[in-house]
Amino acid sequence: MFHITAIDLYGNAFYTETIALPYSNTEEYYRQLTDKVRKFIAENHYPNEKILGISIATQGITSPDNSTVIYGNIMNNTGMKLEDFSRHLPYPCHLEHDSKSAAFLELWNHPELDSAVVFLLNRNLGGAIITNHQIHQGSSMHSGTLEHMCVNPDGPLCYCGNHGCLETYCSANALEQSAGMPVKEFFPLLREKKSPRLAEHWEDYLNHLAFAMKNLNLIIDAPIIISGYLAPYFTEEDINYLLEHHQHRRTIHPGQKPDSGRHPRARIHLPLVQLYIM
């Protein structure tokens, strides 16, 4: 599955489409995907000369020059190249790690933001570090991969091969596995406050999240931003619980919300947009 979104130079999304096409590291996949992109452009009547470029966000750490995925265990896309897409498209193309794109969206929406730790609470956990109003990449592009912080050496096996990573406790997939039901069913039942079992699962989730936040803030003294799929489900009570266990007041902020006027998927294009407005 992949999403296509068209945005302007202000970061506003005009059209978006979701297409069911499972990833496969084959020429046929890249051709089908780029054909869908061309069709999207044609159906929305975008003149070629008005299209400044195409940005591709993927689960996977990219090389420093953003030309190749150097670590992609979730999608099994290690080795995927920007060229796999760009050779089929007559536009400038840009490849980006999806977690870094999410952090860029926070910078775009909050130009006053100097530093932050971003938690991307999606199906798979992600994260990013913002320092000096820039996304910190690290020497090997691994900076901000908080999902692989070990919170329990004897914990569940993570897809990275290690045990007890934060991914195995605080991703949406981990929450569904522990609760035994989809997220969309879990939260309405949780808020009814009639199930001690569900409350226990959620408390365990929040405890692990607060533990990670506290430790990260010992290294990066900056606000915490909660974003991603699970973020809209957090209540004020949940935030206060995190603050109490985090032991640093006024440091947790909600990230981009779906009703904020800018489509969250617009984040994938913002690094490319910046190239044209600077």
Predicted regions and their residues:
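Conserved hydrophobic/aromatic positions in well-ordered beta-strands
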Residues: 5-7, 128
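Hydrophobic "anchor" residues
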Residues: 13, 68-69, 135-136
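Glycine-rich phosphate-binding loop and adjoining helix at the ATP-binding site
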Residues: 16-42, 49-115, 236-247
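Glycine/GP-enriched mid-protein hinge/lid loop-to-helix segment characteristic of carbohydrate kinases
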Residues: 16-18, 25-26, 83, 90-196
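Adenine-nucleotide phosphate-binding core of ATP-dependent small-molecule kinases
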Residues: 28-47, 168-169, 174-236, 254-262
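Acidic/histidine-enriched, beta-strand-rich ligand/metal-binding domains
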Residues: 234-237, 241-258, 262-278
